[in-house]
A protein has these predicted regions:
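Alpha-helical transmembrane spans of integral membrane proteins, capturing the lipid-embedded, hydrophobic core
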Residues: 16-19, 48-53
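Short amphipathic
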Residues: 107-110
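Hydrophobic, aromatic-rich membrane-embedded alpha-helical segments
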Residues: 8-30
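A cytosolic small-molecule/anion-sensing beta-strand core signal
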Residues: 132-133
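Structured binding elements
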Residues: 129
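Membrane-interfacial loop-to-transmembrane-helix junctions in polytopic alpha-helical membrane proteins
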Residues: 3-13, 35-38, 118
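Jelly-roll (double-stranded beta-helix
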Residues: 54-89, 93-104, 116-119, 123-125, ...
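Membrane-interface alpha-helices
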Residues: 3, 24-50
Length: 255
């Protein structure tokens, strides 16, 4: 009698189910008598928490899909310059999203020696740097790029980057965001938390819901977590944070 074989697509589906539905996977692993024995015991011990994480991830993203989109609006502010006390620089808004009808935002940054920000990337806008005075170091995918007076560099969408000042003198530079994507609300919210004692000394919000909102407003993501996990997760958690009312904590800084 000819032995029947399982098609490759069906094998793939069964493998996915084994990871997502723990009881199904447990049954298949022990029924098939996988060798060596440590494979079965490894799945038995680690499969449950892994399966629960996948189900929680799916549950969060599905729940958030029914929630309203983020409110990226900001009030009319008279203060054009704000200070980042943790990272040692100030930002002056030259052109806001309201003033350009969402086409771009432009700021002037004055960065002290030793100041800078963390590795991150954006999925919704391009970030253009133009140095006015001094020397700026822009990290691009792990490699430092020195930008001197009168010169430019660009961080494209999806490019991991950061800026910092390794020189002994302050550096001043323009940053242009195209298109404008709640950049002003992101900056005002983040700096507001720092200056009101609601962030750690290295600038991270003490309340994780605040962090999810700040990242969500500008579609920005940090290093260390793969994009296919981080991007839908931040999108979902930022909407849940708004649903829980944590966005109201930013009103003193943005309204």
């Amino acid at each position: 009698m000819k032995k029947t074989t399982t098609s490759k697509p069906l094998q793939f589906i069964l493998a996915v189910l084994a990871f997502i539905v723990y009881p199904f996977g447990l049954y298949k692993v022990w029924k098939k008598d996988f060798r060596p024995l440590w494979i079965r015991w490894t799945y038995t011990i680690l499969g449950l928490p892994f399966s629960l994480l996948i189900l929680a991830f799916a549950g969060l993203t599905i729940f958030a899909s029914f929630l309203p989109e983020l409110d990226r609006s900001i009030g009319v502010r008279s203060d054009r310059t704000i200070v980042n006390s943790a990272d040692r620089y100030s930002v002056t808004f030259l052109k806001t999203s309201r003033e350009t009808n969402g086409a771009y935002e432009e700021v002037k940054v004055d960065l002290e020696p030793g100041g800078g920000n963390l590795w991150h990337y954006h999925t919704a806008f391009v970030e253009k740097f133009h140095v006015i005075d001094g020397e700026l170091t822009v990290g691009m995918e792990g490699k430092p790029v020195k930008v001197t007076t009168g010169n430019d560099t660009i961080a494209q969408k999806g490019l991991m980057h950061k800026f910092y000042n390794t020189s002994a003198k302050p550096v001043s530079f323009f940053v242009r965001i195209e298109p404008a994507r709640s950049f002003e609300k992101t900056i005002r919210s983040g700096y507001g938390l720092m200056n009101s004692g609601q962030s750690t000394p290295d600038g991270m919000p003490k309340n994780p819901w605040h962090l999810f909102l700040i990242l969500g407003y500008s579609d920005s993501y940090l290093e260390g977590v793969p994009g296919f996990i981080q991007e839908p997760l931040i999108h979902a958690l930022s909407k849940i944070a708004q649903w829980k009312g944590f966005d109201k904590d930013f009103d003193p800084f943005c309204r």
